[in-house]
UniProtKB/Swiss-Prot annotation:
Gene it is expressed from: xkr8
GO annotations of cellular component type: plasma membrane
Keyword Isomerase listed: no
Function: Phospholipid scramblase that promotes phosphatidylserine exposure on apoptotic cell surface, possibly by mediating phospholipid scrambling. Phosphatidylserine is a specific marker only present at the surface of apoptotic cells and acts as a specific signal for engulfment.
Listed name of the protein: XK-related protein 8
Species: Tetraodon nigroviridis (Spotted green pufferfish)
Amino acid sequence: MEQPSIYNYSWVDFVFSVIGVFTFFVDWGADVWVATEFYRRGDFFWFGVLVGLMVLSSVLVQMFSWFWLQYDRGLPDLQTGGGTVLFGDRLRLSCLLHVLQLGFLCRHISAIRQGFRVWWRKEEGSEYAFYLSHDLSMLRLIETFSESAPQLTLMIYVMLRTQRARAVQFVSVAASTTSIAWMVVDYHRCLRSFLPDKARQGWASSLIYFLWNLLLIAPRVAALALFASVVGGYLGLHLLLLWLVFVTWAWLQRTHFMDSPGGEWLYRATVGIIWYFSWFNVAEGRTRGRSAIYHAFITADGAILLVTWWCCREPVQAEPYALALLLTLLLSYLLGLLFKSLYYCCFHPTLWRPPAREPGLPDDLPDADVTFRHLSIQDGAPASRPLNRRMALHAADFYSARTS
């Protein structure tokens, strides 16, 4: 099958790779700075919680990176084409780097190295550059919901408990929330790269997708922080119970993202964390039904969280902002659902899978009915160029709509 134009690596792609490394160091530095501030002020409990979140998130990301490195060692085209992760061909050294929590950084450096070769030196290998960038997009999404979202909840909780907040803290909360929503958009654009060019995500589609994620994630995080401000450690029990429900649901959907049973259970456990904050499609078929079930569940859960906060709050401290905050969260959530409905009605492409044959399909299929360009990879056919199979299959699941 002829390969599409996805492999035209440009200077924009290279810049995004550089920005990825820059944000990696900025995020790491910000985490260290916040942890240091907690320690200096004697807030050793919050210092421990923050460091714990950083360590757990880093270990989770490194585990995914290591699993994928092992899976990709069996791909001869990737190994001989210069598309390997830095030190990926040296097993012991690569293992040591992942133990030292440097595997994610090595992937960023590898993406820059390969991108520079393709863009500046005009060497072949665009497909390898995209292979690396697709993995990075997924790893950044995992880091976002395993570290950034919990840290944002912690930040808002501390502000509520101490009843003290500086302007820089409000700016930090707004920036963190925006960053989380944008990372979801970036991941979605990565998935769209596996669809035909006509289905690429335009600016209008990106804006709508960003807005509904921002308007749904923000009240979710705020509701969790408000609940924690009146019940304290019971938020951990709440997280555990919902996480078990979500992991079970992911198992029932028979996910197949990883290439080993252990890796697949790690993925399902991670999906449980992501679902605690935001919707994330993981299985083949129409997404609207599962999305409706998820949002109905999260809406009911959010209502319980906010009612608990309202009944248990300290009226003297919370009265000046309680009603306004409650109405703002409700309005934000309703607007988020509205924008999401608008996106799925007008912008979301559906992967149409022909029952028998692919050749001879018309070239003027509408955006809502497109054919997955790498369907032959999913069916086990060999490819002339390397393809990030796990991300391609995930894109197929995300957009698929089976026909009889």
